[in-house]
Structure formats: structure tokens, C-alpha cells
């Protein structure tokens, strides 16, 4: 059996580190002890043996799966979707729509697991026109390629395409994009713990500066 690590991702550590710690504790209690991987997915973790990385961030899933030796991935969503140990909150059929993240656009296993989690939480999911493997970018992936104002225009355009104000996101950068676009994002980790998704830093320049500073050190 391969070694296991839990990778909360840089964005969650910046957003709500206490939830990363809480999740780590839940996984340790129910799956056995594992360390928390704090190496950013943009850097080689230099794993010495075959290691399964339990990840949250879509970018982490893509890079740890594809770019480094001795590394394979499974999303936290897949684990929780099949679990019998997590106490899911009940949202009483509240209707929400969703954005599927760019880095895992081709990973139907993740799309299916997330929708199973939403069902377990009694969320009535209204799929947008472009969803799953056919989803389109929230706008954040264009940062650094086009001007910040054009990035924000993309975010506003994406938000306007969604059928509801309440939007499930599982990428923190997607949540920032939805705040720019005037929607109310519901980050999946927040939903699992019945917490409100708050904006904190969401202007693209501010968010990417904060993220880059953290990533450079990890």
C-alpha cells in the first residue's frame, strides 16, 4: 500500500487554515495517521516512495498527478463521497448552481464525487449550460495573460451566464471570481462545515500577489 499525504493546498491555508487542520484531524481519525503536505504543487515534493496525495485544490490534483515522480492523487471529494464517517449538514433542498474548475475539467471522477456530496447535503443543484467536461473558465486562468481589467470582464461575463446567484465552487480562485462577478459563492469546504464563504482578498491583483508570496515560500 502506498504512503498517503494530505495536501490542503496553498489557497485553503490562506483562506481558512483552521478548516485544513480540522480536515486533517478527521482524515487521521478515520483513515489512519498521515502527514500534511505543505509543499506547493508548483514545487517538486521529491517523494522517495509511491505516495497517494489526498488533495482539495484542482491545481494540486493536476500537478501532483502529472508532474512529479512517485505521486498519484485522489480528491478529498472522492473520499468523502464514499465515506460513512462524515457528518453532512442538511441544506434543506436549497438551490445552487456550480462552476467546475479548469485544472480538473477532464476528470469526471471529481465532477461525479462533488455532485454526490451535494446530494448528501440535500442541495438542489441547477446545472449551468456549460458544466462538467464542457465547463468554461471563471476568468482567473487568464490572469497574467491579459490585462487585469479584461480578467475581471471575463469573471463578470462568466457570472452572468450562471442561472442562480448561489454558486458552488471547489476552487478558491473561482470563489474570488464570483465575488468579482457579483454572485455569492459557496466554497465546498465551507458547505461541508456549514460555514459562510467570505470574500477576504478577491481583487485579482491583490489575490494573486498574496498567493504568489505564499507559494514562493512553500
Language-model-derived ranges and their functions:
Residues 1-218:
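Iron-sulfur cluster-binding electron-transfer modules in prokaryotic oxidoreductases
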